[in-house]
């Protein structure tokens, strides 16, 4: 659970305009939410989905931001926020029979990954 996005122990980068459907990315994000930083990297490296590459880059960016900006060791990080939002839809038309045109929608996504220092009770 993320305490606050402005907390000194939280780093939340955003990967915008990823040319992939949000539903395909959501399937990957559900697997890493709540896992440790190192475990989420291992999961993403071995999952067979194309959505793993942009999510892996976002997780690595979150870890680098936490280490550089907040001074938190990467071994102490937990993926506390993993969400995907709809980006703009690119609309194209495909020529069809008898002069018709069918609409093709190319979806984009915005990925937010939040990592925070692990809280031990």
UniProtKB/Swiss-Prot annotation:
<dbReference type="GO" id="GO:0009507">
    <property type="term" value="C:chloroplast"/>
</dbReference>
<keyword id="KW-0694">RNA-binding</keyword>
<dbReference type="GO" id="GO:0003735">
    <property type="term" value="F:structural constituent of ribosome"/>
</dbReference>
<dbReference type="GO" id="GO:0006412">
    <property type="term" value="P:translation"/>
</dbReference>
<keyword id="KW-0699">rRNA-binding</keyword>
<dbReference type="InterPro" id="IPR036394">
    <property type="entry name" value="Ribosomal_uL22_sf"/>
</dbReference>
<keyword id="KW-0150">Chloroplast</keyword>
<protein>
    <recommendedName>
        <fullName>Large ribosomal subunit protein uL22c</fullName>
    </recommendedName>
</protein>
<comment type="function">
    <text>This protein binds specifically to 23S rRNA.</text>
</comment>
<keyword id="KW-0689">Ribosomal protein</keyword>
<dbReference type="GO" id="GO:0019843">
    <property type="term" value="F:rRNA binding"/>
</dbReference>
<dbReference type="InterPro" id="IPR018260">
    <property type="entry name" value="Ribosomal_uL22_CS"/>
</dbReference>
<comment type="similarity">
    <text>Belongs to the universal ribosomal protein uL22 family.</text>
</comment>
<dbReference type="GO" id="GO:0015934">
    <property type="term" value="C:large ribosomal subunit"/>
</dbReference>
<comment type="subunit">
    <text>Part of the 50S ribosomal subunit.</text>
</comment>
<keyword id="KW-0687">Ribonucleoprotein</keyword>
<keyword id="KW-0934">Plastid</keyword>
<dbReference type="InterPro" id="IPR047867">
    <property type="entry name" value="Ribosomal_uL22_bac/org-type"/>
</dbReference>
<comment type="function">
    <text>The globular domain of the protein is located near the polypeptide exit tunnel on the outside of the subunit, while an extended beta-hairpin is found that lines the wall of the exit tunnel in the center of the 70S ribosome.</text>
</comment>
<dbReference type="InterPro" id="IPR001063">
    <property type="entry name" value="Ribosomal_uL22"/>
</dbReference>
<dbReference type="InterPro" id="IPR005727">
    <property type="entry name" value="Ribosomal_uL22_bac/chlpt-type"/>
</dbReference>
<dbReference type="Pfam" id="PF00237">
    <property type="entry name" value="Ribosomal_L22"/>
</dbReference>
């Amino acid at each position: 659970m993320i305490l606050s996005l402005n907390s000194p122990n939280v780093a939340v980068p955003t990967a915008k305009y990823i040319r992939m459907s949000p539903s395909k990315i959501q399937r990957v994000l559900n697997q890493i939410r709540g896992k440790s930083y190192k475990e989420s990297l291992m999961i993403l490296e071995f999952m067979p989905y194309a959505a793993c590459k942009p999510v892996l880059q976002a997780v690595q960016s979150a870890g680098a931001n936490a280490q550089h900006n907040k001074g938190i060791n990467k071994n102490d990080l937990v993926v506390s926020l993993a969400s995907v939002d709809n980006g703009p839809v690119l609309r194209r038309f495909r020529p069809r029979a008898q002069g018709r045109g069918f609409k093709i929608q190319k979806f984009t996504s915005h990925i937010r990954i939040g990592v925070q220092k692990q809280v031990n009770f």
